[in-house]
């Protein structure tokens, strides 16, 4: 029986050495070392041996099995390493190939313009204030001296949530809230989203406004002109400006501020409708009724206010003709501002 065991040993050693895959190696292990394998059958034959032979043959079988298990482990390790190397070689990355191109985002042109405007006014000592976009009719209209019959209160110009709540049509309500909570003197701007039911080449239902307010003693129209002229020059460069008389319910006197056309430089073109000027914002001295509403005495303090559309400034800065392009998420359009 000893010869039979040694023959099996040589046979399995050859098979292990010639095995090329882990699957084949596992088949060899099961055939020889498994519960129904050849060594199990050899162990069963020991019952036919004499009492003297059994310990010797049992020792030989155990030594051979130990040797075979060691060979199986070594071959298993070698085959695993071989498979890993083959896989790594097949998956090797050619670092000379061009990399994947990623599309990186950038600041939206409206946000970029808003930050520019905020920085300009911040350097002039203005506080930057935020407020709710869902507003009361009282703060959106009544407190601003807007008559009950004013067309801006109509459903065609305002989004009503109910009879007393609206989506704010301007950021002016933030000024009312600020004056009710802060003493004078102060300078503040309130940039943010506003809403009106319009949609065409120069209007969208949601857009951005920045309104400003300065209140203190002996504030003059000259102060207004100086601050707004500086703002325009910071945004558009050294251009001429002019102020035209206008009407707003919350300022008296009121004016529209124009800037020299950046296309024709005042000679007249399609953009400025041959006038040489482009309207940039509304402004004026705060109406005494507005000051009274927030508990201020117009005989002791006064001030000026202004409001400018951020989309309009952005369009003029970049020569964009359709306001709706800002909100259509067209990457071909937005990539221009990287």
Swiss-Prot record:
GO biological process, any: phenylalanyl-tRNA aminoacylation
Signal sequence segment: none
InterPro entries the record matches: aa-tRNA-synth_II, aa-tRNA-synth_II/BPL/LPL, Phe-tRNA-synth_IIc_asu, Phe-tRNA_ligase_II_N, Phe_tRNA_ligase_alpha1_bac, Phenylalanyl-tRNA_Synthase, tRNA-bd_arm
Binding site for Mg(2+): 252
Record Gene3D superfamilies: Bira Bifunctional Protein, Domain 2
GO cellular component, one term: cytoplasm
First-tier enzyme category under EC: ligase
UniProt keyword terms in alphabetical order: Aminoacyl-tRNA synthetase, ATP-binding, Cytoplasm, Ligase, Magnesium, Metal-binding, Nucleotide-binding, Protein biosynthesis
Pfam families recorded: Phe_tRNA-synt_N, tRNA-synt_2d
Gene Ontology MF terms: ATP binding; magnesium ion binding; phenylalanine-tRNA ligase activity; tRNA binding
Catalytic reaction equation(s): tRNA(Phe) + L-phenylalanine + ATP = L-phenylalanyl-tRNA(Phe) + AMP + diphosphate + H(+)
Cofactor(s), names only, from the UniProt record: Mg(2+)
Annotated localization: Cytoplasm
Similarity comment text for this entry: Belongs to the class-II aminoacyl-tRNA synthetase family. Phe-tRNA synthetase alpha subunit type 1 subfamily.
Subunit structure: Tetramer of two alpha and two beta subunits.
Entries under NCBIfam families matching the protein: pheS
Stated name of the protein: Phenylalanine--tRNA ligase alpha subunit
Originating species: Fusobacterium nucleatum subsp. nucleatum (strain ATCC 25586 / DSM 15643 / BCRC 10681 / CIP 101130 / JCM 8532 / KCTC 2640 / LMG 13131 / VPI 4355)
